[in-house]
Amino acid sequence: MNINVAELLNGNYILLLFVVLALGLCLGKLRLGSIQLGNSIGVLVVSLLLGQQHFSINTDALNLGFMLFIFCVGVEAGPNFFSIFFRDGKNYLMLALVMVGSALVIALGLGKLFGWDIGLTAGMLAGSMTSTPVLVGAGDTLRHFGMESRQLSLALDNLSLGYALTYLIGLVSLIVGARYLPKLQHQDLQTSAQQIARERGLDTDANRKVYLPVIRAYRVGPELVAWTDGKNLRELGIYRQTGCYIERIRRNGILANPDGDAVLQMGDEIALVGYPDAHARLDPSFRNGKEVFDRDLLDMRIVTEEVVVKNHNAVGKRLAQLKLTDHGCFLNRVIRSQIEMPIDDNVVLNKGDVLQVSGDARRVKTIADRIGFISIHSQVTDLLAFCAFFVIGLMIGMITFQFSTFSFGMGNAAGLLFAGIMLGFMRANHPTFGYIPQGALSMVKEFGLMVFMAGVGLSAGSGINNGLGAIGGQMLIAGLIVSLVPVVICFLFGAYVLRMNRALLFGAMMGARTCAPAMEIISDTARSNIPALGYAGTYAIANVLLTLAGTIIVMVWPGLG
């Protein structure tokens, strides 16, 4: 039996789609030196090659893909978006605006200089900035811009062509820039990171190991009684001196949870909770020959929970003001916008931040109730909320505004982005509403993006040879300019106008470009994860601004003549 693969794929859109995805994802795992191609470029290359052979796909699949992707971008940005927009993220907001705004202006100028159409110009902007949200926003606006069918088809083909030709240029140039730009300025990045560490008293070790607290029991002997000198637990400050917390005391056979007024007596058996290294550093008066193994004394449920910051008495406070250790709890991680932050006592908490806290189950629950809520470790997605807000986003995108003979609307991209932000924001405020496991959200976002990339590649593939020969050199030059010049402008603005610490500034610059590989290079150069503070500050707002940039470039293009 002979199987005509070409006819089989042409006759089955679903089969063609998943063949493109499978081959593209395999290609995306290849590495060029230290650079991995990535899923997006892998799927795009395969779809362009198959598009050259005149394979095509139903445009409805393409539309659904970009809608799912942009909605999930909004959901991820939602918990931190408003706190960055309205409060102490002024510098980060300004940096993101400078980065995106300068790239937009430069792209418009180069597009007019080289005589490109809006499709090539917007695609070049998206590729040079390695930003799929720009591509999605521009594509959606083009479809709702009232072009005739043939002109629209050409613009969309050129959009994906411009993206394909400049994506690797943008990625490689930014990674190279992240490696060498810190060496060209007069302040050493490692020194800047250490300066912040000294000012804020935080750990500069990017590879800090995180242990769970353990519980061990000791009998109070004469040396320990002498060491306490009659002081109660509050006066002693056991945690400050030892790094351990007295969780239980057995006295005369009675087990109790001590308060701050308790005074240790000869023969008491105490349960200490702390990290392993804290137990190792205990004074010999605690340890030598004094450890006991008492089932009841050691029978404690030590848990680790992810606590979401929500309540007004925690939002806007510094981490040190929570006094977690005074309540017998230990902080392991601080996560903002899926980015792990340095544990810094001076970090100002935003609504939606996640604190990984360990300790006795009762104490962790008490802390969680005081500052927010324990994240639901559920694998069940609130599909009702997901679908309802998706519908709301589509309805917002249908709204149009009429000015004389000119009309414009938000479009599906902006509508879905706004609805996603609102769902993410409400989830951060109401623990039982709109829950979407991070794994499920990432899967839907990635799948939507891959479907979209497959669609645009198949659509543009037939014209890539002609386009590459005619404008390849121009695209190379434009891609380098749009990728690197806004980074330099952003650096000058942050260093000499905002006067930011260089470690935080370089992290914020990579966040404004939403480029994780470049962020890793900055952290390696600084030998610290302190730049992650800046990266998290600009990342969420940049995702939103980049989507809007895709819409704006299409809307202002006709007015430039």
Swiss-Prot record:
What Gene Ontology terms for biological process does this UniProt record contain? Answer: potassium ion transport
Keyword Ion transport recorded: no
Superkingdom field: Bacteria
Gene Ontology CC: one annotated term:
plasma membrane
Pfam families membership: Asp-Al_Ex, TrkA_C
Enumerate the spans annotated as RCK C-terminal domain.
Answer: 200-288, 292-373
Return the NCBIfam families for the record: PRK04972.1, YidE_YbjL_dupl
Q: Quote the protein name from its UniProt record.
A: Putative transport protein YbjL
What is the originating organism of this protein? Escherichia coli O139:H28 (strain E24377A / ETEC)
Gene name tied to this protein? ybjL
